[in-house]
Each structure stands twice: as C-alpha cells, then as structure tokens.
Amino acid sequence: VPINSKQKGKRGEREFAKLCRDHGYDARRSQQYAGGVDSADVIGLPGIHIEVKLRDRITEADKLDFIKQAIRDSQMSAKFPIVAHKEKYRQWYVSMEMRDFAYMYTVAYGAPFEGGAVTKTFQVVTMTVEAWFEVYKEFEACMWLKAREEV
C-alpha cells in the first residue's frame, strides 16, 4: 500500500523531532499552515531552520534543491538553514551550505574548518546527524557563552 507523501513527510518530521529530543533539545513539528518565510518543518534547535525530507531515494540534485528551499524559507529569520534527510532503510543525514558549516565549526572549535576550501561558489556539505549534532552542540555552547559575556 503506497504511503501518502504528506503522511510520509509528517512521519519524517516526527522522527527527526524525536532524534533532536534524544540529543537534549525540546524539538517538535512546527505548525505549518501555508509554508513561506521561516516555516520550518521542525522547531526547537536555537538558530537553526530545519527542513525535513524522507524519501525512498535522494540524489545529489535533490539535496541541492532541498537546501535551496531551506535557504529561501529561512531568509527572514537569520537562522542557519539545514536539511535533515533520510532514505528508506538508512540513517539520518544533515546537509547545509558549506560556508555556514565552516562558520559553525570555527566558532565551536576556535579553528578553521579544514574539510575543504570554502569558496564563493555555492557548496553543500552532508554528514551524519550524529556528526552534525557534535558540532552544533559546541557551536551553541560557544554562542551561549558569548551572549552571557555581552550582558
């Protein structure tokens, strides 16, 4: 029995929100009425705009389309756009713009990201959700400390 794509999307959003909660964040599906600016699929990660994609198969072209949607939808929010995606029977991955990831990494670890040259051209980096959360947690802690110092 084929699954309705809307139901599959909701299931993916619930799964990813649970994964975020497992990492210590109070994440949940957002109330998406009509899409548009800052209509993230999942909310609860400070500073992050999350789009979730659950598909049978995801190509590199799909990832590029997904991240472009996340960028477009997050333009007015000043949040880093990410795409959490999962193919059938596989683990979760996160894709985001290379320059955004390089910035998060540099803030988190106080050293430049050496995973590749960051150029002015549009580049996307993809990693396991566990690897992404490792960097994100350090980044968030550094930003929290920085905000405390400014008070």
Regions found by a protein language model. Name each.
Residues 1-151:
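Catalytic phosphate/metal-binding cores of nucleic-acid and nucleotide-processing enzymes, i.e., regions
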